[in-house]
UniProtKB/Swiss-Prot annotation:
<feature type="binding site">
    <location>
        <position position="215"/>
    </location>
    <ligand>
        <name>L-aspartate</name>
    </ligand>
</feature>
<feature type="binding site">
    <location>
        <position position="443"/>
    </location>
    <ligand>
        <name>L-aspartate</name>
    </ligand>
</feature>
<feature type="binding site">
    <location>
        <position position="485"/>
    </location>
    <ligand>
        <name>L-aspartate</name>
    </ligand>
</feature>
<keyword id="KW-0436">Ligase</keyword>
<keyword id="KW-0963">Cytoplasm</keyword>
<dbReference type="GO" id="GO:0004815">
    <property type="term" value="F:aspartate-tRNA ligase activity"/>
</dbReference>
<dbReference type="Pfam" id="PF00152">
    <property type="entry name" value="tRNA-synt_2"/>
</dbReference>
<keyword id="KW-0648">Protein biosynthesis</keyword>
<feature type="binding site">
    <location>
        <position position="224"/>
    </location>
    <ligand>
        <name>ATP</name>
    </ligand>
</feature>
<dbReference type="InterPro" id="IPR004524">
    <property type="entry name" value="Asp-tRNA-ligase_1"/>
</dbReference>
<dbReference type="InterPro" id="IPR029351">
    <property type="entry name" value="GAD_dom"/>
</dbReference>
<feature type="binding site">
    <location>
        <begin position="215"/>
        <end position="217"/>
    </location>
    <ligand>
        <name>ATP</name>
    </ligand>
</feature>
<comment type="subunit">
    <text>Homodimer.</text>
</comment>
<dbReference type="InterPro" id="IPR045864">
    <property type="entry name" value="aa-tRNA-synth_II/BPL/LPL"/>
</dbReference>
<dbReference type="InterPro" id="IPR012340">
    <property type="entry name" value="NA-bd_OB-fold"/>
</dbReference>
<keyword id="KW-0547">Nucleotide-binding</keyword>
<dbReference type="GO" id="GO:0003676">
    <property type="term" value="F:nucleic acid binding"/>
</dbReference>
Length: 585
């Protein structure tokens, strides 16, 4: 036995016991010839006293074994911040397992951390830090909690293939060349979507999986090329059934991991409600700032730009930022104007009161009466700011949504506490792709459309067809997304046809699914939740990299291993691959 106790286990009740501890030396102190070590493992820290005749040369972060006796600390040295703070271990024997050959790039016990890329390059050192290991442990608890909940509710965990067929309808696939069949490729799954539908057809009526997924997409600030999702699918169910089981899981999770009781029923907002109220389909409602249609206050005004927008069917919308006038500088207004223009808007308007009688802001000289009218309706007080935008409603919603998000993140962190969890439903089934010059599925092409909408708009305006889809949003993040699925081959063919996929393309990409539908498919639906994002929210960290053991950078690089990297010519020859174009030597 290499240890009898962990470094976070011993208490005053253990005084007098002979124990064996093992771990890393966090720090060393020499007080008048008596050496004190702080020994650390993932469970905690324990103070060690070395005898004066101990001649071993010890370094920080050495991995050691300590055999000794637990003794009570002198009253004046008790550390109430440590679980083991009332005791120390007098070392009778020290065994060094390994010792650093050189100084570490950084030390886990230090408060000042290096750049993130250094932390990721030496992630094995970073993982020794308590806050990092605690997040990995929390991730484990989240996963176990979800597995237990779903298992108790009749779901079974089934593994689906990682090496599968490329069906590019969405992000790019990661491709894996086949050595045994040169010139052909597997794809790593972007999700187990098709396989979980096939499981439903196979009678596995309640399935789940904690599964790795892969997307070769242009990375944004907080995306990873490989990520983990909690994948759920169920047969003979309605949308309400999926939402109910997911709500129960989330409530159980928050209670078990955070000891937080969530309210009875989660709110449900439609996609259109979200966009019209917050300018986003995943708003953080904790910051308030709900939008209002203020067009009626500007029907008569002296501002030509507003008149032009209203006369062409546009709107004027705005929201109130309470107690913000002292922060609304010209510099900030100019920045928000540029953001609005980059999103296709004409800029923003804003106003506040210098005093109960004096208005300041953009266009105040021409719009004083209009602003006063708005202020009366919205109960705008001294030191409040009203932000407005005029134009086509979709652009106005997008502009105000981005402005609202920036103001909330930058200035109202005090409001962004607790948890705001709700559903968004009735997403558009299709969106137009300028790049492909056709309508594509906003979610995926296997989503069941609103059948009344399909009948009404399929020959006129596909953008008006709603999907039987839903997202769960937590604190401004889309944590999960799902839908009721199409289970009829003819309806699925019709959706592919509306997306202008040829019969040949459909057969090549999805023929196996359509064939399966012919042999009896039950009504089914499901949802996939991002484990990385959910854990990050529970841990209260801003990036999913903090809850992944070995994450990649925002550019998809692994600083630890150097991946992606070149491979040798022999490997390429075996795969019958010839490199061409621009590639790294």
């Amino acid at each position: 036995m290499l240890r009898t106790h962990t470094c976070g286990e011993l208490t005053i009740k253990d005084v007098g016991k002979k124990v064996i501890l093992a771990g890393w030396i966090d720090r060393i102190r020499d007080l008048g010839g008596v050496k004190f070590l702080m020994l650390r493992d993932r469970y905690g820290q324990t103070q060690i006293i070395l005898s004066q005749n101990c001649q071993i040369n010890l370094r920080r972060e050495s991995v050691v074994q300590i055999e000794g006796v637990v003794q009570k600390r002198p009253e004046e040295t008790i550390n109430k911040d440590l679980l083991t703070g009332e005791i120390e271990v007098f070392a009778e024997k020290v065994n060094v397992f390994s010792s650093p050959e050189k100084d570490l790039p950084f030390y886990p016990g230090e408060t000042k951390l290096p750049a993130e890329e250094i932390r990721l390059k030496y992630r094995y050192i970073d993982l020794r830090r308590k806050e990092v290991s605690d997040r990995i442990i929390t991730r484990h608890k989240v996963t176990q909690c979800i597995r237990n909940y779903l298992s108790k509710n009749g779901f079974i965990e089934v593994e689906t293939p990682f090496l599968t067929k490329s069906t590019p309808e969405g992000a790019r696939d990661f491709l894996v060349p086949s050595r045994l069949k040169p010139g052909t490729f597997y794809a790593l799954p972007q999700s187990p979507q098709l396989f979980k539908q096939l499981l439903m057809i196979g009678g596995i009526d309640r399935y789940f999986q904690v599964v790795r997924c892969f997307r070769d997409e242009d990375l944004r600030a907080d995306r990873q090329p490989e990520f983990t999702q909690i994948d759920i699918e169920m047969s003979f169910n309605t949308m309400d059934d999926v939402l109910e089981i997911t709500e129960g899981m989330i409530k159980h999770l928050f209670k078990e991991v955070l000891q937080v009781d969530l309210p009875g029923k989660l709110d449900r907002l439609t996609y259109n409600e979200c966009m019209n109220k917050y300018g986003s389909d995943k708003p953080d409602r904790r910051i308030g700032m709900e939008f209002f249609d203020l067009s009626k206050h500007f029907k008569t005004c002296e501002y030509h730009a507003i008149n032009a927008e209203l006369s062409s069917g546009g709107v004027v919308k705005g929201f109130v930022v309470r107690d913000f006038a002292n922060k609304m500088s010209r510099k900030l207004a100019d920045e928000l104007n540029e953001i609005a223009k980059s999103l296709g808007g004409g800029g923003i308007l804003w106003f506040s009161f210098d005093s109960p009688e004096s208005i300041k802001g953009a266009g105040a000289k021409y719009l004083q009466k209009n602003y006063n009218s708005v202020a009366k309706e919205l109960s705008i007080n001294y030191n409040d700011v009203c932000v407005l935008s005029a134009g086509k409603i979709d652009i106005v919603n997008t502009v105000l949504g981005e402005v609202r998000k920036i103001l909330g993140e930058r200035y109202f962190s005090d409001l962004r506490k607790g948890f705001d969890i709700f559903w968004v439903t009735d997403f558009p089934m299709f969106e137009y792709s300028e790049e492909e010059n056709r309508f594509v599925a906003q979610h995926h092409p296997f989503t069941m459309p609103n059948l009344d909408d399909l009948k009404k708009y399929k020959n006129s305006d596909l953008s008006k067809i709603r999907a039987q889809s839903y997202d769960i949003v937590i604190n401004g993040f889309e944590v999960g997304s799902g839908s009721i699925r199409i289970h009829d081959a003819e309806l699925q063919r019709e959706i592919f046809k509306l997306m202008r996929l040829t019969e040949e393309e459909v057969k090549l990409k999805f023929g196996f699914l359509l064939e399966a539908f012919q042999y009896g498919a039950p009504p089914h639906g499901g949802i996939a939740l991002g484990l990385d994002r959910l854990t990050a929210i529970i841990c209260g960290v801003p990036t999913i990299r903090e809850v992944i053991a070995f994450p990649k950078t925002s550019s998809g690089i692994c600083p630890l291993t150097g991946a992606p990297d070149v491979v040798n010519q022999k490997q390429l020859d075996e795969l019958k691959i010839i490199l061409g174009g621009d590639h790294c030597e």
